[in-house]
Amino acid sequence: LEPRPLLKALREENGCVLLIDEIDKADHEFESLLLEILSDYQISIPEIGTVKATTEPPIVFLTSNNTREISDALKRRCLHLYIPFPDTDLESRIIEARVPEIPPELKRQLVQFIQELRQLDLKKLPAISETIDWARTLVLLHAESLEPKMVKDTLNVILKFQEDIENVSGEVNALTAKIAK
């Protein structure tokens, strides 16, 4: 049996941090497996028996994008922390740190545009990763400010569903006019 991350985490002598990203995309069997790890810091493997955390149990972080509901049993074994989208100031500082070459006015307009988009009824709201990707794209295109044509041409960077792109395309002129002020 080749040790995978869960088994390695339990065997780590000095303890460790285990990140299980996007748990909502895992199947129910994996969720069930996690119940034993999170409650008893052990895993039962029919071929080799029960493996317990050696000295210090791992610190486990689970992330979810809420694509499906996770089980109540798993929720009971976790502390819940909701991280909302950043406000304008924080998002601006994140963009400045991750895309330092972005012109200040473009950064202001981009962040405001994203904040406005998040108020719309979209299938998937743009996350900070999409904002960063869009900022990098606009810098590569030598944009100095958000022009409606460029916004329409690059909406696929921030919106992941064609329906959202089509809906927002009709709003681009109004949104860019609003943030130009």
Question: Where are the regions that the model predicts?
Answer:
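C-terminal regulatory/interaction module of P-loop NTP-utilizing enzymes
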Residues: 1-181
